[in-house]
Every structure is written in C-alpha cells, then in structure tokens.
Amino acid sequence: MLPTLDIQFPLPAGTVLPDYGTNGLYGLASSLRHWLHDRDAAWLPGEVSAGERAVVILLIVDGLGDRFLDTVGQGSALHGARRQTLTSVCPSTTASAVTTLMTGVPPAVHGLNGWFIHDHRFGGVIAPLPLMQRCGPALEAFRLLPRLCPTPPMFHHACRPVNLVSPADIAFSRFSRHHARGAHIEPYKGLEDFGAAIVAMADALAGSGGLIHAYYPTFDALSHTYGCRSAEAGVCFARVDKLFVRLQRALAGRDVRILVTADHGFTDAAPSRCVDIAPESEVARMLAAPLFGERRLAFCKLRQGAEADFEAWAAVELAGKAVAVTGEAFLASGLLGPGVPHPRLRERIGSYALLMEPGWTIVDHVAGETAHEMIGVHGGLSADEMLVPLILART
C-alpha cells in the first residue's frame, strides 16, 4: 500500500505534495537501499536486472529543479535524457532530501526537517550539517551523531560496494563521515576533478558492480546568491550538462547507468516579500526559541500560554503570506513521510509550522548572527521547489 497523506488544514496556493511512493525521491532512495542490501535484487529506476553486477552512478546536482530543466535547460543533453519527474521530500531542502538520499528513509524517520532543527539536548536550535548551534559554537557532546542522527546510512553493511564522490571541503566533515559509513569517500575539487573522480570510481567497480554516489553543490550555491534564473546559474548548468555528455563518452560501451537527480528545486523571493520578525517585536516575545526549519517552511516554538496571541497575530500578519498549522496537525498530516518517527520529531516540529505562500519567506534574528541575504530559496511546497528530474543514460 502506498503511503497516504492526511491533510486537515489549508495549503499554500499551488502546493505540490510530496510523493512517498514511486514518484518521489524517497521511493528512489528506498529502492536503492534495497538494491544495495540484496545481491539478487533488481533496481527499476536504473534499469538494473535482478542479479546483475551493474555499475550505477547517482549524480545529485543540488538545486536542479524540474521546472528549471524544462525552461532554461530546454534542448540540453540532460533534458533529453529525462525519464521522469519526481517530488522532493518535505521540506524541500538539502538537509532533509540529501539525508533521505543517503539513508533511504524519509524526514519523519531520520529527523532532519530543515537546515535548522530544535533539539534541547544540544542547546536548542542547531544546524545539523555543520553541527553548530544557531549563531553559536560547534556542537560537542558524548555520542553526538548517533544520538542526533540514529538512522544508519544505506551504505552501512551493504552487500554491494559504494564510493562517495564528495566536495573536499565537506567530504570528511563529522556529518559526512557519519553518513558515509560502509562507503569509500573520494574527495574532489572543482568540476573537472569531479568528472575524473567519477570515471576513476567507475573503473574501480568494473568487475564487481556497485554504486557511485556523487554530489555537486555549486548550482545550489549560485542560485542562492544570484537567483535561480540568473546568468550565473545558467552557466553552471551548461557546465554540468557538458559533464554529463563527457561521462557518457568516457564510459561508452560499458553499460554504466548514469542517473542524475536533485534534492530540490528553487524559487526566487524578493526582499519585499519577506516577513521579518524584528527583535523585541510583539511576536518575537511570543517565541521561546529562534525559528527553525527553513525560511520557506519554518517551525516555531512558542512560550507557554502564547498560543491564542500567536494565532491572532498570524491571522492578520500572515494573511496571504503563509499558512500557520499547529505542530500536532502538521505531524499527523504525513508531510514528513511514513515510518516510525524519529524519537525527537515532535520537538523538532515545534508549536506551529509556517507554510509560506509562493514567493514569500520568513526570517528572524539572533544576536551576533550575520544575515544571509538570499535571492534563490527553497524548502517550500511550490512546484518550482518540489519537482526534480530523474535523468538516465546507459553508456
């Protein structure tokens, strides 16, 4: 039976709900996990037959949305090889989606429901990927990662070899090493080195078959800084498209499966469409902690007794800008996916979820924190953010 959602509240205009069946990133990751752990399994997304010793490359281009591919990417090699449109998970963000692509479980289970999460054991609002408090020091605690992220990576105890091709600046971070258990880590610097590392790892797996999990973050970084339809993002896409062609040529005749997908897409947000919670404002005094989650889908923890005042504020100040949903209703909706929930999930959702309308963001401020201005954003439920391509080439 396919997982179903139970939405008992209004949704932002144009919402695309996450698909936790065969038409979403979770289904792709879950089936990949099964293939890695069963020598006799087939893997339909990669056209891998049962028992076949295939070399599979899963190339994740951070931020490459399906809507972008359909417009800016029209006529590209990547566009021509697209097989399917998938949904991201909720929230449509790297911390949630890439962790799903490394574990094979949805955000409800792995527990990373945004760039920032709330976990009082480690100081309140924290960023789990860099393992920092929000505008605070690096996290240090006994058995930090096993407690924070107890779900094992899909590579752990896999019966097929796995090589992770990862940017050198994050390849051996604490978060990366924790989620790479069972795999070989191959760091790279720059796009040319990225391609060379992928080919070298494919050569290493030629006899045994296995997975090359390759991650490229630059498109995402440029889209945040310059906008998702900027010239800079377009140039980066063109370079990735050329890499896709080069990989097919370098691996020609070997029936390597090259799959390309993304963790999420992008939308641009103007500064004039930002709900800015000023320090010491009426609503700031209702909050028991800084916002967490994403600026396109935020979670908030209220002070005890502030619920009625917050709802009254939201009814006026968020009208046409966001949908405020109680934490209980958001959890029950299934938007974070099926499965046994992470033991801290209820805390990580907070008192309310704020689902931003198209083009809107919400931010707050922490003393000493440097504001990060972003033109391109993601995390929300719009089609631009939620839809990602599944691209396949067989060499």
Language model features: what each stretch is:
Residues 54-57, 208-218, 256-258, 352-354:
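Generic beta-sheet signal
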Residues 64, 229, 264-265:
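Catalytic metal-binding/acid-base residues of hydrolase active sites
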Residues 80-100, 284-304, 370:
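A short, conserved beta-to-alpha structural element at the edge of catalytic cores
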Residues 289-395:
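Active-site neighborhoods of enzymes that stabilize oxyanions during catalysis
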